């Protein structure tokens, strides 16, 4: 006979803190998960702005600051990175400083920066 959610919750409610701790450890072992991430997520809102400022940035924006001397190579690099057409890529390069790509993981942002710098552009990752 399977237990329903209400019965499981009632059983958990009747446990002591020590029993709950042991239950969590056994669940972590059985399912190969960690309850630490949930504890951090719950504690973060209570800590307020200090915790938010301490968090590592996960999304980055690649900003074209200046096209440099070799504008044609920069336009080609922008087209490869963004998939834009020739006119759109040229307008983006001419309108610098402008974001080229947004919400990228750090590795992708660094790769895009490297590609644009190799083409002769000045680039920032924010």
From Swiss-Prot:
Lineage of producing organism: Bacteria, Pseudomonadati, Pseudomonadota, Betaproteobacteria, Burkholderiales
CDD domains named in the record: Ribosomal_L7_L12
UniProt xrefs under Pfam families: Ribosomal_L12 (PF00542), Ribosomal_L12_N (PF16320)
Record function comment: Forms part of the ribosomal stalk which helps the ribosome interact with GTP-bound translation factors. Is thus essential for accurate translation.
Disulfides per UniProt: none
Family: Belongs to the bacterial ribosomal protein bL12 family.
Organism, scientific name: Bordetella avium (strain 197N)
NCBIfam families, A to Z: L12
InterPro entries, per the entry: Ribosomal_bL12 (IPR000206), Ribosomal_bL12_C (IPR013823), Ribosomal_bL12_C/ClpS-like (IPR014719), Ribosomal_bL12_oligo (IPR008932), Ribosomal_bL12_oligo_N_sf (IPR036235)
Gene Ontology MF terms in the entry: mRNA binding; structural constituent of ribosome
Entry-linked HAMAP family: Ribosomal_bL12
Gene Ontology terms: cellular component: cytosolic large ribosomal subunit
Name the UniProt record assigns to this protein: Large ribosomal subunit protein bL12
Quaternary context: Homodimer. Part of the ribosomal stalk of the 50S ribosomal subunit. Forms a multimeric L10(L12)X complex, where L10 forms an elongated spine to which 2 to 4 L12 dimers bind in a sequential fashion. Binds GTP-bound translation factors.
Entry coiled-coil feature ranges: none
GO biological process entries: translation
Keywords annotated in UniProt: Ribonucleoprotein, Ribosomal protein
């Amino acid at each position: 006979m399977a237990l329903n959610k209400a019965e499981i919750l009632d059983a958990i409610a009747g446990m002591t803190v020590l029993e709950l701790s042991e239950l969590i450890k056994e669940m972590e072992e059985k399912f190969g998960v960690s309850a630490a991430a949930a504890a951090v997520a719950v504690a973060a809102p209570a800590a307020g702005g200090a915790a938010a400022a301490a968090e590592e940035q996960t999304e980055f924006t690649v900003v074209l600051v200046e096209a440099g001397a070799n504008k044609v190579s920069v336009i080609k690099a922008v087209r490869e990175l963004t998939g834009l057409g020739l006119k759109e890529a040229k307008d983006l390069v001419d309108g610098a400083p402008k974001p080229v790509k947004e919400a990228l993981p750090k590795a992708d942002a660094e790769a895009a920066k490297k590609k644009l710098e190799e083409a002769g552009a000045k680039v920032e990752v924010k």
